[in-house]
Design a protein with these regions (language model features):
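A short glycine-rich, His/Asp/Glu-containing loop-to-beta-strand
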Residues: 1-36, 95
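A generic structural signal for short beta-strands and their flanking turns/coil linkers
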Residues: 18-23, 43, 50, 73, ...
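Short, conserved beta-strand element in jelly-roll/cupin
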Residues: 26-27, 37-54
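Histidine-centered metal-chelating micro-motifs
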Residues: 32-34, 53, 69, 73-79
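A generic beta-sheet turn/junction motif
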Residues: 40, 56, 83-85
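Short acidic-glycine-tyrosine-enriched beta hairpin
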Residues: 58-73
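Ligand-binding loop in jelly-roll beta-barrel domains
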Residues: 73-97
Length: 97
């Protein structure tokens, strides 16, 4: 995925039976992806490392280690690292079918 590195923790293949998934993603790029995530369910994020920006539809806001936020169902979302900062690493979780 280019400047994104994803590690999956839970999926339907290893324990989630209702369509849930969780993992970590490292966002090394300082640009927002032109292919944001969009899901039929909400997705929660917790920032583990780094500093950057999250974009939910047209809303852009700063994020840093210790922050958390939720992308509601159907909301396009993407993350980028702030220039000159450590890459943003997030833990994410979403569930439902």
């Amino acid at each position: 995925m280019g400047d994104q590195y994803i590690i999956l923790f839970l999926t339907e293949k290893n324990g989630c039976t209702n369509g849930c998934a969780s993992g970590t993603t490292i966002y090394a790029s300082t640009q927002f992806s032109d292919r944001p995530g969009v899901h039929e369910d909400q997705e929660g994020f917790y920032v583990l490392e780094g500093e950057g920006y999250a974009k939910l539809d047209d809303l852009v806001f700063p994020i840093k280690k210790g922050d958390s936020f939720v992308a509601l169902a159907g909301v396009a979302h993407t993350i980028r690292t702030k220039e000159g900062c450590e890459p943003v690493k997030v833990f994410w979780f979403h569930s439902a079918k």
